[in-house]
Amino acid sequence: MNPIDQFREQTRSWLEANCPPSQRKAIPEGELVWGASDVEFHNADAQLWFERMRDKGWFCPDWPVEYGGAGLSAEYNAVLESELRRLKCRPPQINLGIWMLGPVLLEFGSEEQKKNLLTPMTRGEVRWCQGFSEPNAGSDLASLKTSARDAGDHFVVDGSKIWTSYGDKSDWMYALVRTDAKASKHAGISLIVLDMKSPGVSVAPIDLISGKSAFCQVFFDGVKVPKSQLIGPLHGGWNLAKRLLQHERKAMSKFGEFSLPTHFHLLPLVKQYLPEPVGQSESALVARAVASAMNEHSYNLTVQRMGEEARAGQDVNGLMSIMKLVHTEQERDKFEVLMDVMGYHALGWDKGAFTPQEQAITRGWLNSFALTISGGASEIQLNVIAKRVLGLPDVK
């Protein structure tokens, strides 16, 4: 048996023995495990799965061992991902730091930063949020105004960030700040990390139409940030931001691989609400559902293939924008089909004769509209595709 096949056999046996059966099914609303200083578990099995994967180094299996990873090569990491999918294992934790900031730190961070920031990520001990968008700097991110004034051994940060996911629950933030107000808007930006408990940081949740408040506005009033928390070169944050956004779009485009609350299996739901389609209209709904499910399956296979290409060293950065755009449209299409199939059952809210699943689907439909903006607006993705994939010139 060659080493890869041997590793696959060992991995399969370990997962069969260590992933509790309850952690091999879709995650209900409220059971996500977020890596954090005050991590919460819905049940003992979730904690057991978290601890076993953490101790194995499989939160970040392809990260170096010295930072808490398992040091797996791309080929071995692909085997692990394949076996996790085969068994339908839940993600042991959700951690934006691992998905987005971590790869940037591995590439651009100092050795001290890697030791201080990466290790807590690989142990699920810190919850991260992203400080990019501002009230007047969304799609045009380089127009940001939040300033970081040089004060000797530290920066003094003033301004605000908006649409910060889970800012009220996060331990740390990675943020873009303006460190040179006189430079061109792309040239005077730096990337820093800061403790959300620092004096001068305040957070205000934003109420959403879905009834939830995942987004926040964060205010900075004279916040002191040590210069050791500057990531990469001073005034060089824009290039790091572009790299980080590539990882963000990759993470968002991979959501379909995970059994997250909004990842509803379409065809079983169609069978549930239309057990025996009657007439042309219901038959047409079934046909739409089958087409949507096939598109979703094709998308997931493409994401897996792109992951293999990326691990083999191929440049897939431009393709990430394509996948993010496709994912957005597929989610909207899927929930539109569900709304039509479920009829009045799709009107579920907090109260009334609706199941938790029906209420979650209604919220998923509302959230699907926001996907056209979050993680990079669809219009921005089209511009990236035009330039980086199709090679079209700028139009002045």
Language-model regions, residue ranges each:
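Glycine-rich beta->alpha junctions and the first turn(s) of the following alpha-helix
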Residues: 201-301, 371
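Amphipathic, small/basic residue-rich leader segments at the start of a protein or domain
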Residues: 1-95, 116-123, 267-279, 285-288, ...
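C-terminal helix-coil-helix/basic helical segment that borders enzyme active sites and/or dimer interfaces
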Residues: 27-31, 275, 280, 297-353
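A structural signal for short hydrophobic beta-strand segments in well-ordered beta-sheet cores
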Residues: 146-149
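A short core secondary-structure module
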Residues: 154, 158-204
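N-terminal glycine-rich flavin-associated loop
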Residues: 93-112, 138
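Glycine-rich phosphate/cofactor-binding loops in nucleotide/flavin-utilizing enzymes
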Residues: 79-80, 100, 240-247, 252-256, ...
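A short, Trp-centered hydrophobic/proline-enriched beta-strand micro-motif
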Residues: 124-132, 176
